[in-house]
Every structure is written in structure tokens, then in C-alpha cells.
Amino acid sequence: MGPLSGVKVIEVAGIGPGPFTAMMLADMGADVVRVDRADRAGGDPEVPPADVLYRGRRSLGVNLKSDEGVQVVLDLVEHADALIEGFRPGVAERLGIGPEECLERNPALVYSRMTGWGQEGPYAHTAGHDINYIALAGALAHLGRAGEQPTPPINLVGDFGGGGMLQAFGVVCGLLEAQRSGEGQVIDAAMVDGSATLMTMIWAFRAMGIWTDERGTNMLDTGAHFYDTYETADGKYVSIGSIEPQFYAELLRLSGLEEHLAAKGKELPYQMDASHWEELRGELAEVFATKTRDEWCEVMEGSDVCFAPVLTMEEAARHPHNVERGTFVEFGGITQPAPSPRFSRTPGAIQRVPAHPGQDTDDVLVDWLGMDDSGVAALRDSGAVA
């Protein structure tokens, strides 16, 4: 029984950040029902979809272009604590399931709207993807190496960090407030806003005069030799994050950088003298190229260098640290990340494998709305659900 056990959530099916929010809530015990399009219903329940982003919740197939289908969603709203939708601004209203209609049915509902640009603004009604949202937020400009083009971070910043994860935080905040006030509200969760929020520390560094807009020249963006990745003798990589003086001293001791420089007749410059960072990166690159990744693990693991091997997804799932912690689990025959964060008394858990669209229509109508078989059959016959 996770910490959100007893909470009921409607997820109007979408892609990316919305499903991630719903997955996080379901992992923590919420009863999440995904409203899928009726015309996409079907699939062999014995062969669940491989998209584990859809794990943990039931699916109801609904025709939102029919009045009866819309009424089904509004009936569900009466029993829900929260609703998540990811349409462009105005679409939910045109369908008849916008905030006004839903809050009229359930004044305590937390209604969360996930978009890239937000509900208003010059870009609000235009298409976009993660790369565009983090570009406008000022985040993408700082990802990549000096002299090279910005590098998209595989949708982690916009869709999932600044999008789905912050929306989940917003929904839980809304639920807590609704418990106190008895009133619901609308959440405008925009990926451009969330991505900007994730940049707060960098804005602080900029205000402090220790960060510039020149990509790849700052301490945390591959500008510094002591905070970077290095190729090893076998073509693999290791990561180094030796920022603090005591950690940097460990890096020097275990890498032999100082001796490497002395052999060339060079002295070791002050760590924070940025004018030497590029030169020292080249020297460290030579050092790390002398051993394989596993050999460097033997040298540095267990120390205070701030070191870790750069692993592929497959390697990460097998690493002893992750295995001991259960960071990854096999569920439904698919290896995937385990629910996070961890609770000592009410831990989260993957509740079920992903459902095909409409796989649980009858079950949801009976469970949430108390319908009998004839009522369910009538809705199916009308085409309102599938």
C-alpha cells in the first residue's frame, strides 16, 4: 500500500510527460484510470504492451466525440480526486471535459493541464517538443561542449523533469490543499516553466558571477577538467566530479596526474584557475587512456574521488550497487526502473503491467460507477465506450 493509496486519478491519454506523471502516481499507490480513445481499443491481454511508461493503471476506452462518452468521463470525475490532461489549450473545453465542466461536477477536483508552452502566451497554441521547450527556457543553450552545437538531453529536462515530474509534484500539492480547503483548482503545468525551474541553481550562479552564457566553459558544463567524462583504453568512459578540494586531492593521488605533469616538466596549476582547465583536461585524458574502464574502477571505486563508470542501460541494470538496491526490477518480463523515491512504511510498487487501450472498460465502469452488466452493455452498444 503506497503513500497515495486511496487516491483516484483520471488520466486522459496522452504522450510523454502526462503518462510519466500518471506512472509516478500509480507507483505510489494511486488508483489511476487512463481514458483512451475508443477507436484504439483492443489487443491481447496475454501480451501486454512493452511501453512500461503505461504501467500500473487500468484503461477505459471512451469515444469523446459522443455525448454519452463525455458523460462517462464526467461521471468518473465525480468519483476522482484528480484529473490529468495534455491537450493543447482549449481542446478539453471543446470536448466538454474542460475545467469548468469537471469542477462543476466535483468542486474538490484537482485538474492538471500539461502542455509545453503553457495555457497562454504567444507560443501557447503552436506545436512543439521537449527540444523546443528547453530551448525557450534557456536550458538547451547550456548543454554541450564549447564550440559545439547544443546537445539535446534525450527529453529528460523538458518532458520528464520539468514536465511530468513537476506535474506530479503539483498534483500532490493540489491534493493536500484540497484536503484542507475542500476546494479543487486548476494546475497549469508547462514544460517551459518547469525547465526554467530546473535551472534555478544556474541562475543563482549567474547572479553570483560564477557562470557565463558561453557553453562548455563553466565548472559544471564540461568546462572544468575535474568535472567531465574521460575515454578509457577500451573505448569506454568514466565520470569525474572532483569539485571540492579534498575530492580533487583524491583525484590527483589516485590518477597520478601530478606525477604525469612532472614527467613533462610541468607544475600543477591551482584547481580553480580556469585558464588552465583546457590544458589539464588534455593531460587527464592522456592519463585515463592508459587503463581500461574496469581497471579505473578498481583504482577509484570506494574512494572520495567522486567517480563512477559511465554505463549503458544494460550495464546499469547489472551493476552490483543497483542490484543490491533494487534500482531496476523485472516486471512482466521487462527490465525497468523501480518506483522512486522509497518510503520506509508505505513503499510504492508496480501495480500491474501496461494495459491495452480499453482493456479494463467494464471493470472500471463497475468499480468506479457501480454500473451493472446491462448498463455497461448499453454504453458499448451506443459506441460511447469500447
Label the predicted regions.
Residues 226-303, 307:
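Aromatic-enriched alpha-helical interface/lid elements that frame and gate functional surfaces
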Residues 117-118, 191-196, 234-236, 242-247, ...:
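Glycine-rich beta-alpha junction loops
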Residues 137, 163-185, 197-208, 250-259:
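Oxidoreductase and adenylate-handling cofactor-binding alpha/beta cores
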Residues 149-158, 231-236, 346-349:
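Flexible glycine/proline-enriched surface loops and loop-helix/loop-strand junctions
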Residues 301-322:
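Conserved PLP cofactor-binding pocket of PLP-dependent enzymes
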Residues 1-170, 174-180, 356, 362-386:
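N-terminal helix-loop segment corresponding to the beta1-alpha1 unit
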Residues 1-8, 231-233, 315-386:
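Terminal low-complexity tails and localization/encapsulation signals of metabolic enzymes
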Residues 119, 148-158, 179-195, 215-222, ...:
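Conserved Rossmann-fold dehydrogenase catalytic segment
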